Amino acid sequence: MRVSQSLIPFAIIALVLSFVNAYDPSPLQDFCVAIDDLKGVFVNGRFCKDPERVDAKDFFFSGLNVPGNTNNQVGSNVTTVNVDQIPGLNTMGISLVRIDYAPHGQNPPHTHPRGSEILVLVEGTLYVGFVSSNQDNNRLFAKVLHPGDVFVFPIGMIHFQLNIGKIPAIAFAGLSSQNAGVITIANTVFGSNPPIYPELLARAFQLDANVVKELQAKFGSI
Protein backbone atom coordinates (compact mmCIF):
# COMPACT_ATOMS: atom_id res chain seq x y z
CA MET A 1 0.00 0.00 0.00
CA ARG A 2 1.43 3.40 -1.04
CA VAL A 3 2.07 5.98 1.68
CA SER A 4 0.45 9.35 0.96
CA GLN A 5 3.14 11.84 -0.07
CA SER A 6 1.32 14.64 1.75
CA LEU A 7 1.96 12.90 5.07
CA ILE A 8 5.70 12.49 4.65
CA PRO A 9 6.42 15.99 6.09
CA PHE A 10 4.54 15.03 9.25
CA ALA A 11 6.74 11.98 9.64
CA ILE A 12 9.88 14.04 9.10
CA ILE A 13 8.79 16.68 11.62
CA ALA A 14 8.01 14.03 14.23
CA LEU A 15 11.39 12.40 13.80
CA VAL A 16 13.24 15.73 13.89
CA LEU A 17 11.50 16.62 17.13
CA SER A 18 12.78 13.39 18.65
CA PHE A 19 16.33 14.52 17.91
CA VAL A 20 16.05 17.71 19.96
CA ASN A 21 16.45 16.11 23.39
CA ALA A 22 18.33 12.89 22.82
CA TYR A 23 18.67 10.65 25.86
CA ASP A 24 22.07 9.09 25.14
CA PRO A 25 25.23 11.00 26.18
CA SER A 26 26.31 13.69 23.72
CA PRO A 27 29.32 12.83 21.53
CA LEU A 28 32.63 14.63 21.99
CA GLN A 29 33.70 14.13 18.37
CA ASP A 30 32.06 14.53 14.95
CA PHE A 31 31.08 10.86 14.85
CA CYS A 32 31.95 7.44 16.23
CA VAL A 33 30.88 4.87 13.67
CA ALA A 34 30.31 1.58 15.49
CA ILE A 35 32.56 -1.32 14.57
CA ASP A 36 33.17 -4.79 15.99
CA ASP A 37 36.95 -4.36 15.95
CA LEU A 38 38.19 -4.95 19.50
CA LYS A 39 41.25 -2.81 18.75
CA GLY A 40 39.11 0.29 18.25
CA VAL A 41 38.24 3.05 20.69
CA PHE A 42 35.36 2.13 23.03
CA VAL A 43 32.67 4.86 23.16
CA ASN A 44 29.09 4.54 24.46
CA GLY A 45 29.10 0.76 24.41
CA ARG A 46 30.61 0.36 20.94
CA PHE A 47 34.06 0.54 19.39
CA CYS A 48 34.75 3.39 16.96
CA LYS A 49 35.82 2.94 13.37
CA ASP A 50 38.93 4.83 12.29
CA PRO A 51 37.54 8.23 11.13
CA GLU A 52 39.74 8.06 8.04
CA ARG A 53 37.91 4.89 6.95
CA VAL A 54 34.39 6.23 7.51
CA ASP A 55 32.27 6.80 4.41
CA ALA A 56 28.66 7.58 3.45
CA LYS A 57 27.44 3.99 3.74
CA ASP A 58 28.12 4.13 7.49
CA PHE A 59 25.26 6.65 7.77
CA PHE A 60 22.82 5.06 5.31
CA PHE A 61 19.92 2.60 5.41
CA SER A 62 17.51 1.60 2.67
CA GLY A 63 14.23 -0.25 3.07
CA LEU A 64 11.74 1.72 5.15
CA ASN A 65 9.51 1.88 2.09
CA VAL A 66 9.05 -1.91 2.28
CA PRO A 67 6.04 -3.11 4.33
CA GLY A 68 6.84 -5.51 7.17
CA ASN A 69 5.30 -8.98 7.37
CA THR A 70 2.34 -8.80 9.76
CA ASN A 71 1.40 -12.47 9.42
CA ASN A 72 2.10 -13.35 13.06
CA GLN A 73 0.29 -13.76 16.40
CA VAL A 74 0.03 -10.04 17.14
CA GLY A 75 -0.56 -8.83 13.58
CA SER A 76 2.22 -6.25 13.46
CA ASN A 77 5.83 -5.87 12.38
CA VAL A 78 8.48 -3.43 13.57
CA THR A 79 11.30 -2.54 11.18
CA THR A 80 14.06 -1.13 13.38
CA VAL A 81 16.73 1.32 12.27
CA ASN A 82 19.14 1.70 15.17
CA VAL A 83 22.89 1.52 15.63
CA ASP A 84 22.88 -2.11 14.50
CA GLN A 85 21.55 -1.08 11.08
CA ILE A 86 23.30 2.31 10.79
CA PRO A 87 26.62 2.18 12.66
CA GLY A 88 26.96 5.95 12.27
CA LEU A 89 24.16 6.37 14.83
CA ASN A 90 26.59 5.45 17.59
CA THR A 91 26.69 8.31 20.17
CA MET A 92 23.98 10.23 18.26
CA GLY A 93 21.18 9.39 20.71
CA ILE A 94 18.56 8.71 18.03
CA SER A 95 16.94 5.85 16.11
CA LEU A 96 13.68 5.17 14.34
CA VAL A 97 11.27 2.41 13.42
CA ARG A 98 8.56 1.68 10.89
CA ILE A 99 5.56 -0.19 12.30
CA ASP A 100 3.09 -2.05 10.08
CA TYR A 101 -0.23 -3.24 11.49
CA ALA A 102 -2.65 -5.70 9.93
CA PRO A 103 -6.35 -4.90 10.43
CA HIS A 104 -6.97 -5.36 14.18
CA GLY A 105 -3.25 -6.03 14.65
CA GLN A 106 -1.41 -4.60 17.63
CA ASN A 107 1.97 -3.66 18.98
CA PRO A 108 1.34 -5.27 22.40
CA PRO A 109 2.10 -3.58 25.74
CA HIS A 110 5.84 -2.99 26.02
CA THR A 111 8.42 -0.51 27.29
CA HIS A 112 11.63 1.04 26.00
CA PRO A 113 14.02 1.15 28.98
CA ARG A 114 16.49 3.56 27.36
CA GLY A 115 14.43 6.02 25.34
CA SER A 116 11.27 8.04 24.82
CA GLU A 117 9.25 7.59 21.62
CA ILE A 118 7.39 9.96 19.32
CA LEU A 119 5.07 8.26 16.83
CA VAL A 120 3.40 9.68 13.72
CA LEU A 121 0.60 7.78 12.00
CA VAL A 122 0.84 7.85 8.22
CA GLU A 123 -1.97 5.51 7.24
CA GLY A 124 -4.93 3.84 8.98
CA THR A 125 -6.48 4.37 12.42
CA LEU A 126 -4.76 3.48 15.69
CA TYR A 127 -5.80 3.36 19.32
CA VAL A 128 -2.63 4.16 21.28
CA GLY A 129 -1.73 4.88 24.86
CA PHE A 130 0.57 4.50 27.84
CA VAL A 131 0.10 3.84 31.55
CA SER A 132 1.86 5.98 34.14
CA SER A 133 3.79 4.65 37.14
CA ASN A 134 2.42 3.39 40.47
CA GLN A 135 3.35 6.77 41.96
CA ASP A 136 0.93 8.39 39.51
CA ASN A 137 -1.81 5.81 40.22
CA ASN A 138 -1.31 3.96 36.93
CA ARG A 139 -3.31 6.44 34.87
CA LEU A 140 -4.08 5.55 31.26
CA PHE A 141 -3.35 8.20 28.63
CA ALA A 142 -4.90 7.09 25.34
CA LYS A 143 -6.03 8.54 22.02
CA VAL A 144 -7.39 7.43 18.68
CA LEU A 145 -4.97 8.54 15.96
CA HIS A 146 -5.71 9.37 12.35
CA PRO A 147 -3.18 10.01 9.54
CA GLY A 148 -0.97 12.95 10.45
CA ASP A 149 -1.55 12.62 14.21
CA VAL A 150 1.41 12.38 16.59
CA PHE A 151 1.65 10.79 20.05
CA VAL A 152 4.48 10.66 22.59
CA PHE A 153 5.36 7.71 24.85
CA PRO A 154 7.58 8.75 27.81
CA ILE A 155 10.68 6.73 28.59
CA GLY A 156 10.04 3.53 30.52
CA MET A 157 6.23 3.76 30.40
CA ILE A 158 4.23 0.68 29.33
CA HIS A 159 2.57 1.58 26.03
CA PHE A 160 0.75 0.00 23.09
CA GLN A 161 -0.84 0.54 19.69
CA LEU A 162 -3.92 -1.21 18.23
CA ASN A 163 -5.17 -0.94 14.65
CA ILE A 164 -8.91 -0.38 15.08
CA GLY A 165 -9.49 0.09 11.36
CA LYS A 166 -10.42 -2.32 8.60
CA ILE A 167 -7.32 -1.57 6.52
CA PRO A 168 -3.60 -1.93 7.27
CA ALA A 169 -1.99 0.91 9.22
CA ILE A 170 1.51 2.37 8.96
CA ALA A 171 3.38 4.47 11.51
CA PHE A 172 6.90 5.80 11.93
CA ALA A 173 8.47 6.54 15.30
CA GLY A 174 11.61 8.27 16.50
CA LEU A 175 13.35 7.19 19.72
CA SER A 176 15.74 9.18 21.90
CA SER A 177 18.42 6.49 21.97
CA GLN A 178 20.67 4.79 19.46
CA ASN A 179 19.31 1.53 20.92
CA ALA A 180 16.23 2.13 23.08
CA GLY A 181 15.66 -1.57 23.78
CA VAL A 182 12.26 -3.19 24.10
CA ILE A 183 10.60 -5.24 26.85
CA THR A 184 7.34 -6.87 25.76
CA ILE A 185 5.39 -7.38 28.97
CA ALA A 186 3.65 -10.71 28.27
CA ASN A 187 6.75 -12.28 26.72
CA THR A 188 8.91 -11.11 29.60
CA VAL A 189 6.64 -12.19 32.44
CA PHE A 190 5.33 -15.46 31.01
CA GLY A 191 8.17 -16.32 28.65
CA SER A 192 11.23 -15.77 30.85
CA ASN A 193 14.14 -18.20 30.75
CA PRO A 194 14.17 -19.93 33.18
CA PRO A 195 10.48 -19.53 34.05
CA ILE A 196 9.31 -17.52 37.03
CA TYR A 197 7.66 -19.67 39.72
CA PRO A 198 4.00 -20.14 38.66
CA GLU A 199 2.88 -19.70 42.28
CA LEU A 200 4.45 -16.25 42.39
CA LEU A 201 2.76 -15.14 39.16
CA ALA A 202 -0.54 -16.72 40.22
CA ARG A 203 -0.66 -14.56 43.32
CA ALA A 204 0.64 -11.45 41.56
CA PHE A 205 -1.98 -11.66 38.81
CA GLN A 206 -4.72 -13.25 40.95
CA LEU A 207 -4.86 -16.29 38.66
CA ASP A 208 -5.00 -20.03 39.17
CA ALA A 209 -1.52 -21.57 38.99
CA ASN A 210 -2.66 -23.86 36.17
CA VAL A 211 -3.66 -20.82 34.11
CA VAL A 212 -0.20 -19.37 34.68
CA LYS A 213 1.39 -22.61 33.53
CA GLU A 214 -0.74 -22.52 30.37
CA LEU A 215 0.41 -18.97 29.68
CA GLN A 216 4.03 -19.93 30.28
CA ALA A 217 3.66 -22.80 27.85
CA LYS A 218 2.09 -20.47 25.28
CA PHE A 219 4.94 -17.98 25.57
CA GLY A 220 7.64 -20.64 25.56
CA SER A 221 8.83 -20.40 29.15
CA ILE A 222 8.03 -24.07 29.90
From Swiss-Prot:
Gene Ontology molecular function: manganese ion binding
InterPro entries: Cupin_1 (IPR006045), Germin (IPR001929), Germin_Mn-BS (IPR019780), RmlC-like_jellyroll (IPR014710), RmlC_Cupin_sf (IPR011051)
Subcellular localization(s) per the UniProt record: Secreted, Extracellular space, Apoplast
CDD domains reported for this sequence: cupin_OxOx
Disulfide bond positions: 32-48
Domain (Cupin type-1) ranges: 62-213
Alphabetical keyword list: Apoplast, Disulfide bond, Glycoprotein, Manganese, Metal-binding, Secreted, Signal
Signal peptide: 1-22
Binding site for Mn(2+): 110, 112, 117, 159
UniProt KW Disulfide bond keyword: yes
Database matches in PROSITE patterns: GERMIN
Glycosylation sites: 77
Gene Ontology CC entries for this record: apoplast
Pfam families for this protein: Cupin_1
UniProt keyword ATP-binding, yes or no: no
Family: Belongs to the germin family.
The protein's assembly and partners: Oligomer (believed to be a pentamer but probably hexamer).
PANTHER family on file: GERMIN-LIKE PROTEIN SUBFAMILY 3 MEMBER 3
Purpose: May play a role in plant defense. Probably has no oxalate oxidase activity even if the active site is conserved.
Protein name, per record: Germin-like protein subfamily 1 member 16
Protein species of origin: Arabidopsis thaliana
